[in-house]
């Protein structure tokens, strides 16, 4: 996924956690825990892999109808009854142009509804990095911080917005998502999900062998913080891959100290 990173790469920084589940394991965990994050099995939407290979050699990787069908074919094949999509735009997103991101979101919502799946999409801005962490272990660490009741305000805001949409589609529009987050229920589910997939939720995440601090060269206010250069820098450090078979350095990444609008000192 280049500079955008992959969800499974991030979760695989957790010692013991496994992404591959059989169908029986998937449904058993969904019933017992209520949450699963796993890799799509090869038999889920087998035509998608072949179509992607064709897109790669025909210059149609950025075709919105083909992107939408690739994403939605897997979601529909899962037997999903309701689906919430987080469609990002901006310099740090796969689809940078807001108009094209909106077109992609509308296309996927239409496909979902045509297939009988209750589908909504949120358009979210990735011109500025989300949160303060960039990289695999870094972002997992920040996610755990949010589940513990802390973390950056923008990550909390997006998390709550997505949760509200999910619960509304599930017939629970009045559920108090803030209370579940603050009261520890969300963290309990996270720990149960990680444990069910072989991971240790208490294990230390990979730490870098060395680090370098970048400081302000003058006093002032940070007025801009473009996501793309940070993503590329983390990718070059090893947090992403250029080819599917490339290894990922789990501890590689960047931790930001401030967001735009913050005062900095030399």
Feature map (PLM): residue ranges:
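Well-ordered secondary-structure scaffolds
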Residues: 60-63, 67, 77, 81-266
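Surface-exposed charge patches
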Residues: 9, 28, 73, 110, ...
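Active-site nucleophile and cofactor-binding loops and adjacent substrate-binding regions
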Residues: 1
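Phosphate/pyrophosphate-binding betaalpha-module
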Residues: 4, 12-78
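Short acidic, glycine/serine/threonine-rich loops at helix termini
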Residues: 5-9, 40-41, 48-52, 94-99, ...
